[in-house]
Amino acid sequence: MSETVRLTVGQAIIRFLVNQFVEADGESKRLIAGAMGIFGHGNVAGIGQALLQNELDATPDGGEMPYIMPRNEQGMVNAAAAFAKATNRQQTWMCTSSIGPGELNMVTGAAVATSNRLPVLLF
């Protein structure tokens, strides 16, 4: 019998995303290539702590999710959309910010991604 693994919601989300792959032309790639986030007072999902924990628990076989801290929420989503376009819509980045003005700034980038049919994952 296996031992129960206790995770927070944020840790479970990150662990799930790290294990999502897409296969095309016989090549397997991670669907969510990494995470970008600007953390402030209202990040309720616990994603920041989960990303740090994922980095600390990383194994040599590449089980970690890279994290970048951008300076602007709209630019962050636009960068994720550009990455999705560059990889032929087979990979994208996860974007997260605090609740409030930061989330609202992400909406414009999400509209651009939606109008161009580019995948981005927003938290």
PLM regions and their residue ranges:
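Thiamine diphosphate
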Residues: 1-102
